[in-house]
C-alpha cells in the first residue's frame, strides 16, 4: 500500500485508539527490510554508540497537539492550576507513548538521543488574537531506536532516554544503564502578585514562594517516578523556569497575577545487574627524557660526573619496560 492509498479516516481511528498512524506503520515496516537507517545522532555520538554496543535501527518520533484550557478561568486564588499541569503531563505522555510504540514496532531495546520540542500557542477569544483565550500545546519527541542487549528491560518494552551516544558510552564504562525517562510539569498561579508580599526595594516574596513551591511539587513527583523505575540517580536534567505576568480581570480587577511554569526532564540511571569492573590493560612505564635549557640532546657537558650513571640507569629502565611488555603480550 503506497502513501497515496492511505485511508485517512482509518488512520485517524488507529490514532484515537492509541495506536500509530498507518503512514508511520508503513515507514517503519519499510525501514526494517533493509540495512539503511535514519538517525538524529552526530558522527561522534554514532561512533560512541556503536562502541557501547548500541546498533541503530531507525529514527522514531511521537507528537501530540493538546488543548490545555483557558487561562482567564483561574482567578481569585493562589495555587497550582491542576487542570493545566495535568494537560501538559498528558500531552507529553501521549507524545512519548507514540515514540515508544514506534520503537516497539521495530524491536528496539532503547531510544537514545531523544530531542524534545515544545511549543505553546495562546489563542485569542473568538479568533481575534491576543492572549486572553485558550492554550494549545504542541509537544514533539524524536530519537534513534537502537538494539542494545546489555540494557535491562522487560520484553518488548524499550527504554526511552535523552542521553546521547557519548553519555551512554561513559555510563556503560562505569557499569550503569538508563532505566527510564522522567518528566514533570507544574503551573502555579499567584493572585495579585504586586498587592501582597511586596515592599519598595525588597523581594517580591509571593513570587519567590510560588517559584519554590512549584519546584517542590515537580521534584517530589520526579522522585516518585525515579522510585518506580528503581533509579539510583537522575542525569541529564533539563530544568526550565518561566514566569509570566498575566492580567487578573477578575470582577473588573485591574491588578496583575503571575503564572509560574516549571518543567523538568531527565533520565533515571541504575547499576547494570551483575556488572563487574573490567580489568584495565597494563601500560608499560614511559621514560621521559629531560634536557636542561641550553643543552642539546646527547651533548655531554664537562664536569657532569653523574651523566654517565644517569644514562646507564635510563637504558636499564627502558630494557626492563620492554621485557615487561613482552611478558604481558605472551600471557
Predicted regions and their residues:
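Short, well-ordered alpha-helical segments
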Residues: 60, 65, 74-117, 182, ...
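Beta-rich nucleic-acid/ligand-interaction surfaces
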Residues: 118-124, 241-248
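Intrinsic disorder/low-complexity detector
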Residues: 2-84, 125-208, 244, 251, ...
Amino acid at each position: 500500500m503506497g502513501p497515496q492509498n492511505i485511508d485517512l479516516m482509518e488512520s485517524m481511528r488507529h490514532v484515537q485508539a492509541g495506536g500509530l498512524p498507518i503512514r508511520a506503520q508503513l515507514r517503519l515496516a519499510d525501514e526494517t527490510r533493509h540495512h539503511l537507517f535514519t538517525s538524529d545522532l552526530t558522527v561522534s555520538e554514532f561512533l560512541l554508540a556503536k562502541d557501547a554496543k548500541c546498533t541503530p535501527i531507525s529514527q522514531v518520533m511521537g507528537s501530540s497537539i493538546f488543548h490545555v484550557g483557558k487561562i482567564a478561568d483561574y482567578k481569585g486564588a493562589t495555587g497550582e492550576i491542576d487542570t493545566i499541569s495535568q494537560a501538559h503531563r498528558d500531552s507529553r505522555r501521549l507524545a512519548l507513548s507514540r515514540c515508544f510504540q514506534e520503537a516497539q514496532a521495530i524491536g528496539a531495546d532503547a531510544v537514545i538521543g531523544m530531542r524534545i520540542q515544545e511549543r505553546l500557542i495562546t489563542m485569542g477569544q473568538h479568533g481575534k488574537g491576543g492572549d486572553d483565550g485558550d492554550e494549545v500545546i504542541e509537544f514533539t519527541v524524536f530519537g534513534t531506536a537502537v538494539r542494545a542487549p546489555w540494557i535491562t528491560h522487560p520484553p518488548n518494552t524499550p527504554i526511552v532516554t535523552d542521553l546521547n551516544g557519548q553519555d551512554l558510552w561513559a555510563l556503560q564504562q562505569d557499569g550503569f544503564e538508563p532505566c527510564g525517562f522522567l518528566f514533570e510539569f507544574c503551573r502555579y498561579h499567584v493572585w495579585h502578585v504586586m498587592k501582597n508580599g511586596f515592599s519598595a526595594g525588597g523581594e517580591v516574596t509571593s513570587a519567590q514562594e510560588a517559584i519554590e513551591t512549584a519546584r517542590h511539587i515537580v521534584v517530589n513527583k520526579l522522585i516518585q517516578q525515579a522510585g518506580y523505575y528503581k533509579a539510583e540517580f537522575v542525569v541529564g536534567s533539563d530544568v526550565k523556569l518561566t514566569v509570566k505576568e498575566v492580567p487578573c480581570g477578575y470582577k473588573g480587577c485591574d491588578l496583575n497575577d503571575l503564572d509560574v511554569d516549571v518543567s523538568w526532564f531527565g533520565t533515571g540511571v541504575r547499576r547494570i545487574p551483575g556488572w563487574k569492573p573490567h580489568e584495565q590493560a597494563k601500560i608499560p612505564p614511559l621514560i621521559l627524557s629531560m634536557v636542561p635549557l641550553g643543552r642539546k640532546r646527547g651533548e655531554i657537558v664537562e664536569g657532569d660526573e653523574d651523566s654517565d650513571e644517569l644514562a646507564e640507569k635510563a637504558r636499564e629502565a627502558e630494557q626492563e619496560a620492554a621485557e615487561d611488555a613482552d611478558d604481558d603480550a605472551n600471557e
